Structure formats: C-alpha cells, structure tokens
C-alpha cells in the first residue's frame, strides 16, 4: 500500500486517547485502524491544575503504542491535537515535550473553540441531513456545543464540564444517590445557562451527539430493543435504574459495557442538564467527530451536502452495481409510495431509507447470484455507511434480506430504526418495485395503480397485461402468496 495515501489523526482527550488511521481513495476515506485507550488524564489534575506524574505516564505509555503505527505515515499527513486537560494543566509543556519525542511529530494544544469547530466538521462529513443542527460532544473535561447548517457553523461553545471532572466532583464517593445526580445536573445547568440563549437564537431542527456518553446510550437502547432516538424520558429512566444500583461499582444496565460504566453516570447527568436547559426533544448519534474533522481537514475535502448519496455512489461503484436498474427500482418504489402515502403516512426519513435500499438491493450479486439477498444484507450490516445510523443500517440490511423469497417477519420487527408496521410497509413496496422492474427496461414497466386501505393493498394492472405476460403473472401470484403467509393482503386485478 502506498504510504502517501495514509492519514492519521490522534486526539489526546481528557478521558481517552484515540488514533484513527485512514486511506484516501477516490475522494473518500477508508478506515484502516482505530485504537482507543482509557487514560483518564483529567483524573490526574489536582486543585492547582497540576497534572500528576502517574497520569502523564499513562498518557506516554499509550503514545508508545500509537508511535509504532505512525512510522508508516508521512509526517505532513499526521495531525495530533490535545484538548481540555492539556489546555488547563500548568505543566502541560512537560507532557507535550515528551509526547512529541515519542510520536516524532508535533502535538498541538487546540482551543475549545477550535475543538468545537473540528467536531462539527467531523459530524458534517459523516452524518446525514443538511438541516440546521445542534451538535453536542461531552468529553472528559469539556463539553462542546455547536449550531450550524450544512458545513457552516453559526455558534461554537466549549464549556468546562466533562464526564471525568463531574465524576471526581459529584460522584467521588461512588454513590449513585439522587442527591449526587441533582448536584451534578444543577452544576451543569449553571455552566450551560450563559450560552443557552445564543444557542436557542440560532436554533436547530435536529440534534446529534458525538460523545462516548451518547455512544453508550445508543448501545443500551439497541441492546434493549428501543428505537435509537434519545429522549429526556429515556435518560430519566436510565438515571432511576442507576440510582437503584446504589453504587458505581455495582452499576449494571443491559447494554452498558464495563469500559463505559465508570463515567456513564456523570455523563448522563450532564446530558440530562443539556436536554432540560435547551429543551431538546430528541437526539441521535453522530457518525464522526473530532478525529474525522482532523482527517477531512487534511484531505481538504468539501462537505457533501448529501452524505447518504455520496455513500450510496461509493458502494455502487465498489460493487459494480447496475445504477440504471437501481434508479429504475427506486423510481417505481417512490411512485408506489406516493400512491399510498395518504393511507400509510410514511415519514420523509422512512422514504429516504426505502430509496436507499432500492439503490443497494443488487450489491449481493457481486458475491453470487445464489442467496444474493443474504449477501446484500451481510454487506450492508458490515460496511461503513457514513450518513446512516447503526439502527438505519440494520433496517437497510433487513429490507435487503427480505427483498424476495418468503418474508422473515421477525427480522423486520427486530430492527429499531422505524416502528415494525412501517418496516413491513417499506418491505412490501420494495418487493413490488423489484418485481415489476425485473425486465430491466423502462418501456416494459406497466402502468400500475396501487391503493392501500389499512394493511390491504390493491394492485391494478392494464386490462390485458396478465394475459400477455404469463411469467409475470406467475411471479405476481407467487408474491401475493408470500405476502399472504405473513398476513399482508395483496389483491391483484
């Protein structure tokens, strides 16, 4: 592999040190290595902001691991940044001097505002939707809040509160009591209050979280079969569960890993304060943050206003997809959707996910014609899909698995991107679109009327079409039978 195509971004955070190594290929990035080590640098700061020798040694030990990987990458293509703890530490110079010797490249201590800007760029490059957004990143010693639209930020704030510092300040007795949560939330709201008006002034339509706390919440909700939207009600529910556990060392929540458990209560308290103070309705997980912002900055790639479309194009190119056929199926599925939208009330994001499934439905053919839907589902589950959340990836994989042959209803109910009923509806439309576009020519797609009454679908074809298309009739009859097996009434006329 040509080393000139490799790039590395290292984030010396207050809780963890992270390294991301990517390969640049045809204007997009391919992740090669992700290494994360819990260093808890912020825990080594005393009241005089002096960083302990033990904390520094933990950091240097981690950097020795990173240094081995950096030997393969040209120095101009490496960026190392340090954040809140090393902004605060009075003896940061000592740590940084040795860090630079270990890594063999410069270490830059960035301002809170620059950290917020880079986080936003990482989100903008990897997270779907170009609407006005609020980005929240709870770090070990600072929390960044950024508003913006597309690639442009409108406000940037870095606040002195984080999951490690709040752990040491409000949960130092390791007691998960209501009083400790109350104190932690009140303190976080006090920190937020001076910037809340400006954030609300700029406004947002969507809110995304880019931190370990939000990642932990996503893992918990996936494990417990909830949908992926984080809400205040869910946060309060998890807080009560933590309080029931009593002590930090006894904290057990389904889906919460041991690695994340230590700073989870403090991060949860900060997030509850943010939701409450800013009246956030819901939040989803971002696709990237600081490290992705660093990488895309080195590559000087413009932010694609439609990240999902870029992702679909890259995958289609990689797996040699017949894009004419993909577009034909998508056009037909969209036509069906418009005909039933008054009855089914499918939301715009669900429509977008249906059309994404149409664009990807044939990627399994790149493996083998036999069991192509299984191959397609496997690929989508395991590919990196910038712009799509983990739950959305799971839905796409489930739709591709069920694009033909008998329906696996349980798989449609096990995804949590959309309600089970909506997943069933999207699946039905996808299957019909694939069936009627099967001859791969626009002029051979018949005029089809589709009507929905509750879950009953009535499909009307031109009067003599079935008589002149015996194979088509056989395929439609088979599809009607398969749908009837899972109690999806389909009447063909």
From Swiss-Prot:
Record's keyword annotation contains Ligase: no
Gene3D superfamilies the record matches: 3.30.420.40, Exopolyphosphatase. Domain 2, Hypothetical protein af1432
CDD domains: ASKHA_NBD_EcGppA-like
Protein's organism: Salmonella paratyphi B (strain ATCC BAA-1250 / SPB7)
Chain segments annotated as transmembrane: none
Function: Catalyzes the conversion of pppGpp to ppGpp. Guanosine pentaphosphate (pppGpp) is a cytoplasmic signaling molecule which together with ppGpp controls the 'stringent response', an adaptive process that allows bacteria to respond to amino acid starvation, resulting in the coordinated regulation of numerous cellular activities.
GO terms of biological process kind: guanosine pentaphosphate catabolic process; guanosine tetraphosphate biosynthetic process; nucleobase-containing small molecule interconversion
EC assignment: 3.6.1.40
Pathway assignment: Purine metabolism; ppGpp biosynthesis; ppGpp from GTP: step 2/2
Family: Belongs to the GppA/Ppx family. GppA subfamily.
Highest taxon of source: Bacteria
Name of this chain's protein: Guanosine-5'-triphosphate,3'-diphosphate pyrophosphatase
InterPro entries, per database record: ATPase_NBD, GppA/Ppx_hydrolase, Guo-5TP_3DP_PyrP, Ppx_GppA_C, Ppx_GppA_N, PyroPPase_GppA_Ppx
Annotated keywords: Hydrolase
Catalysis: reaction(s): guanosine 3'-diphosphate 5'-triphosphate + H2O = guanosine 3',5'-bis(diphosphate) + phosphate + H(+)
Any one GO molecular-function label of the UniProt entry: guanosine-5'-triphosphate,3'-diphosphate diphosphatase activity
């Amino acid at each position: 592999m040509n080393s000139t195509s490799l790039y590395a971004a290292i984030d010396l955070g207050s809780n963890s040190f992270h390294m991301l190594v990517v390969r640049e290929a045809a204007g997009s990035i391919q992740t090669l290595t992700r290494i994360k080590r819990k260093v808890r640098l912020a825990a080594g700061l005393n009241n005089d902001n002096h960083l302990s020798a033990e904390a520094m040694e933990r950091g240097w030990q981690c950097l020795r691991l990173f240094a081995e990987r950096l030997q393969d990458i040209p120095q101009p293509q490496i960026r190392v940044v340090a954040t809140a703890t090393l902004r605060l530490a009075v003896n940061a110079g000592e740590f940084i001097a040795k860090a630079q010797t270990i890594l063999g490249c410069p270490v830059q201590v960035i301002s809170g505002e620059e950290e917020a800007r880079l986080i936003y760029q990482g989100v903008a490059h990897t997270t779907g939707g170009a609407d006005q957004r609020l980005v929240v990143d709870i770090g070990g010693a600072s929390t960044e809040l950024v508003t913006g639209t597309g690639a442009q930020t409108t406000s940037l704030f870095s606040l002195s509160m984080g999951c490690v510092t709040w752990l040491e300040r409000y949960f130092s007795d390791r007691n998960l009591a209501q009083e400790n949560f109350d104190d932690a939330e009140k303190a976080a709201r006090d920190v937020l209050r001076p910037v809340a008006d400006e954030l609300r002034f700029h406004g947002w339509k969507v809110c995304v979280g880019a931190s370990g706390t939000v990642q932990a919440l996503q893992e918990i909700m996936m494990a417990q079969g909830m949908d992926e939207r984080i809400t205040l009600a869910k946060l309060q529910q998890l807080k009560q569960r933590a309080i029931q556990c009593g002590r930090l060392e006894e904290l057990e929540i389904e889906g919460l890993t041991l690695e994340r458990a230590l700073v989870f209560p403090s991060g949860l308290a900060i997030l509850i304060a943010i939701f409450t103070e800013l009246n956030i309705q819901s939040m989803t997980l971002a696709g990237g943050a600081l490290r992705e912002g660093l990488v895309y900055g080195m590559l000087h790639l413009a932010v694609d206003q439609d990240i999902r479309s870029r992702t679909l194009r890259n995958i289609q190119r990689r797996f040699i997809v017949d894009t004419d056929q993909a577009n034909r199926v998508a056009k037909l599925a969209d036509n069906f959707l418009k005909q039933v939208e008054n009855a089914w009330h499918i939301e715009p994001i669900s429509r977008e996910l249906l059309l994404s499934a149409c664009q990807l439905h044939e990627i399994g053919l790149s493996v083998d014609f036999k069991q192509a839907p299984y191959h397609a589902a496997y690929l989508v589950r395991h590919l990196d899909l910038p712009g799509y959340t983990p739950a959305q990836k799971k839905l796409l994989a489930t739709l591709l698995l069920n694009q033909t042959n008998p329906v696996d209803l349980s798989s449609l109910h096990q995804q949590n991107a959309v309600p089970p009923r909506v997943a069933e509806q999207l699946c039905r439309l996808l299957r019909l679109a694939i069936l009627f576009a099967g001859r791969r020519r626009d002029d051979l797609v018949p005029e089809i009327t589709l009507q929905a009454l509750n879950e009953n679908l009535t499909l009307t074809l031109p009067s003599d079409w079935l008589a002149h298309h015996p194979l088509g009739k056989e395929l439609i009859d088979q599809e009607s039978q398969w749908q009837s097996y899972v109690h999806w009434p389909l009447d063909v006329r």
